[in-house]
């Protein structure tokens, strides 16, 4: 068996380097290099490095040292690697110094052109060199880096370091100044070759090599931009600030108007954004925008805010949108605009209501229409110009709450009714909308109007007052079958429930249910008691109302004529048989009926209240009565009888024997008789409308009287719920929770809450903790 001796190679370093230097000259002159020549250079580097290693390893083996299967780290190998690394560095340094010397004589745009051209050539040539010395990169340089040796770089990085130390550091001030001057020229309207700037920017980014740290240790993104930011971006932002500070000052000192200024700022911001995309590094986008915004917007906020109110008055929505977008770009830029908007909307709302105050006080439709016109105008503005920004939405809400709850219309009401007037008018508008009429809107329009009503309803502070008025009017629509549409009624209840919760509409839903049950009950009654009623009985429909769900109605006693009393008596028997233990209380004040009359020149069908029917039927017995006689015959009291007779006189069905001061204030001694000359174009005449107007006035008075007492009950119940859950609560926390829980229904006054707490302590629902007067305890 024969031993094969390792191939022994020797290389003269001077010969090898001469060959490599010639190849580098070709690369740095940007001459074509054939692939074969490139591979020859690469192989020369490889052979030179490995030949020294192999030779040294052979000698070590002959001296009896252990042989290794991998090339050993030897002093000879270190020397060769370091020698070649130094020669590469010296070659590049000589090349760069020559380039620098030529550029030192240039300035301005000529310098930028020269610099970018030479840099691009240098970068490409250095990439070629990096490939030629790839073996050096992978072995000696990599080993040096792994062992933590400083000031050692991969060949391409070495080229960048040499460029930075020997060219950039000498020319940087002139180059950066030339860049800034070129950018300034573009800002003033000149055409420039942006490639000169982008080329230098690319160079600065590539020069992001930290001399003090190895390539392996660097945070690539942060360190990569270090040169760019330190030497260019800082000065660029400073120049930008100075340029736009002067431009803004010149514009405003020459009397420029706010619209032109905003357009100019928009244009400049767009130009700077384009500039960044075209020839600056993307990392500059944010600081550049911040710089421009600071100078052009933040420093001019007073000027912009001062003109905001005028733009609102002139309804220049496009300019308002422009101002919003600009001010939104800077910290706290919108704060004053929000305040101005709130004040302006509140002022507009109050002025609009002042213009219609006299008519709107009694015209619910006009009142709500005026509120909506103001709100819709500014809701549209907030949507389109202010992009529904939450702060501007809040400004609209605050302003709307202000002028909807307290305005010129509400101030025309009596003092005790001012707080409830807005809620009352909104409820009356709902009643008009949902009540049968000759001009009822179609289904789609009704849905749209209901949605608009909910806009106003949202801002009503006293939603409990609205509920009282609405419930009263809703009950009358149901009782008198005056609803325009069952579906529309149900739809509106759903909207109220969606905004205020189930509890708010529970009574309304129960009322609807009662009417449905009553229809079935009436049909069952007519079927089962047909024989008792007989063929000559009156047409009869009944509503059985749950006492806890419906508003409280006056139960004025009255003596019914025999035609009615018999039917009512039979129904009472039927109901007691069906529901044993329940008690019926007849509410004649809310009952209606129809009377066919032939006492006049033509036949009429009158719709009348129970009291009106009883009064009119008396005239079947004789031609005239005193009011006192009518009261005695019907068992009406001295307050009700004159009012009922007065309503019939006002409708011209009856006439008094003497002239009355007021038709609704008929003295008990007055004599009245049928007005046999009564004429009306309509055959069907509703006599109950007059009493309905009287009821409306009375309802308003009753709601106003009951609001405070009802609120005390609600507040007390809320306090008990909180105490029952918490057991022990601090005074301020209890106050806060009560206000929070009830704010959806009304705004409870602090004094009223305190009185309710005191009352509950007296009733022993709760007590003040001994020694801690601001702490309450619940008593089971």
Curated annotation (Swiss-Prot):
Neddylated; which enhances the ubiquitination activity of SCF. It is found in: Cytoplasm. There is a cross-link at residue 724 (Glycyl lysine isopeptide (Lys-Gly) (interchain with G-Cter in NEDD8)). InterPro entries: Cullin, Cullin_CS, Cullin_homology, Cullin_homology_sf, Cullin_N, Cullin_neddylation_domain, Cullin_repeat-like_dom_sf, WH-like_DNA-bd_sf. Pfam families: Cullin (PF00888), Cullin_Nedd8 (PF10557). Pathway: Protein modification; protein ubiquitination. It comes from the Eukaryota. GO terms for cellular component: cytoplasm; SCF ubiquitin ligase complex. One of its GO terms (molecular function) is ubiquitin protein ligase binding. Component of an SCF (SKP1-CUL1-F-box protein) E3 ubiquitin ligase complex composed of cul-1, fsn-1, rpm-1 and skr-1. Interacts with Skp1-related proteins skr-1, skr-2, skr-3, skr-4, skr-7, skr-8, skr-9 and skr-10. This is Cullin-1. It comes from Caenorhabditis elegans.
């Amino acid at each position: 068996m024969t031993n094969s001796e390792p191939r022994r190679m020797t290389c003269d370093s001077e010969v090898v380097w001469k060959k490599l230097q010639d190849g580098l000259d070709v690369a740095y002159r940007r001459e074509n290099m054939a692939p074969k020549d490139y591979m020859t250079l690469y192989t020369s580097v490889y052979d030179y490095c490995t030949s020294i290693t192999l030779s040294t390893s052979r000698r070590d083996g002959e001296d009896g040292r252990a042989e290794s299967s991998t090339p050993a780290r030897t002093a000879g190998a270190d020397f060769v690697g370091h020698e070649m690394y130094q020669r590469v560095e010296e070659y590049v340094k000589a090349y760069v110094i020559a380039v620098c010397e030529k550029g030192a004589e240039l300035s301005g745009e000529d310098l930028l052109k020269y610099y970018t051209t030479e840099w691009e050539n240098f970068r490409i040539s250095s990439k070629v060199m990096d490939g030629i010395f790839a073996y050096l990169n992978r072995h000696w340089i990599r080993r040096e880096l792994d062992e933590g040796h400083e000031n050692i770089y991969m060949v391409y990085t070495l080229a960048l370091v040499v460029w930075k130390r020997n060219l950039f550091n000498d020319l940087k001030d002139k180059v950066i100044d030339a860049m800034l001057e070129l950018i300034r020229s573009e800002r003033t309207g000149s055409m420039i070759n942006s490639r000169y700037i982008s080329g230098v920017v690319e160079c600065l980014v590539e020069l992001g090599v930290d001399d003090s740290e190895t390539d392996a240790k660097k945070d690539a993104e942060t360190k990569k931009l270090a040169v760019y930011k330190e030497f260019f971006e800082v000065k660029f932002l400073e120049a930008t600030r100075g340029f736009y500070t002067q431009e803004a000052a010149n514009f405003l000192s020459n009397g420029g108007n706010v619209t032109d200024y905003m357009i100019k700022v928009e244009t400049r911001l767009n130009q700077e954004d384009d500039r960044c995309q075209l020839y600056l590094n993307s990392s500059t986008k944010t600081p550049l925008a911040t710089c421009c915004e600071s100078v052009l917007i933040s420093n001019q906020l007073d000027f912009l805010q001062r003109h905001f109110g005028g733009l609102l008055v002139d309804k220049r929505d496009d300019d308002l949108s422009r101002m919003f977008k600009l001010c939104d770009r800077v910290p706290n830029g919108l704060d004053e605009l929000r305040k101005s908007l709130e004040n302006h909307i509140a002022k507009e709302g109050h002025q609009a209501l002042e213009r219609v105050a006299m008519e709107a006080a009694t015209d619910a439709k006009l009142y709500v229409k005026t509120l909506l016109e103001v709100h819709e105008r500014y809701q549209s503005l907030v949507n389109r110009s202010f992009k529904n920004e939450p702060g501007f939405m809040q400004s609209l809400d605050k302003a709307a709450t202000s002028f909807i709850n307290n305005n010129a219309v509400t101030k025309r009401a009596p003092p005790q009714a001012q707080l409830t007037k807005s809620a009352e008018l909104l409820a009356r508008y709902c009643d008009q909308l949902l009540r049968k009429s000759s001009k009822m809107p179609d289904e789609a329009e009704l849905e749209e109007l209901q949605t608009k009503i909910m806009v106003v309803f949202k801002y009503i502070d006293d939603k409990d007052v609205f509920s009282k008025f609405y419930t009263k009017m809703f009950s009358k629509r149901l009782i008198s079958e005056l609803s325009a549409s069952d579906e529309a009624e149900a739809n509106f209840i759903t909207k109220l429930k969606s905004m205020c919760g189930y509890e708010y509409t529970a009574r309304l839903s129960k009322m609807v249910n009662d009417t449905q049950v009553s229809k079935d009950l009436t049909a069952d009654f007519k079927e089962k008691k047909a024989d008792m009623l007989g063929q000559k009985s009156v047409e009869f429909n009944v509503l059985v109302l749950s006492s806890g769900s419906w508003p409280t109605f006056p139960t004025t006693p009255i003596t019914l004529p025999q035609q009615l009393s018999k039917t009512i008596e039979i129904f009472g028997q039927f109901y007691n048989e069906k529901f044993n233990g329940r008690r019926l209380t007849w509410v004649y004040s809310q009952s209606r009926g129809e009377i066919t009359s032939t006492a006049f020149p033509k036949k009429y069908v009158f719709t009348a209240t129970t009291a009106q029917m009883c009064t009119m039927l008396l005239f079947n017995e004789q031609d005239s009565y005193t009011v006192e006689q009518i009261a005695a015959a019907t068992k009406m009291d001295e307050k009700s009888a004159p009012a009922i007779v007065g309503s019939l006189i006002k409708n011209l069905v009856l006439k008094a024997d003497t002239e009355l001061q007021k038709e609704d204030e008929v003295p008990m001694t007055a004599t009245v008789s049928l007005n046999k000359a009564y004429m009306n174009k309509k055959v069907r005449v509703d006599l109950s409308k007059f009493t309905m107007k009287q009821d409306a006035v009375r309802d308003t008075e009753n709601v106003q009287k009951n609001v405070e007492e009802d609120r005390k009950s609600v507040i007390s119940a809320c306090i008990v719920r909180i105490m029952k859950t918490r057991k022990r609560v601090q005074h301020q926390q209890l106050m806060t929770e009560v206000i929070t829980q009830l704010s959806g229904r009304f705004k409870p006054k602090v004094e009223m809450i305190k009185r309710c707490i005191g009352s509950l302590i007296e009733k022993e629902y709760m007590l003040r903790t001994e020694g801690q007067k601001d702490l309450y305890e619940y008593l089971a």
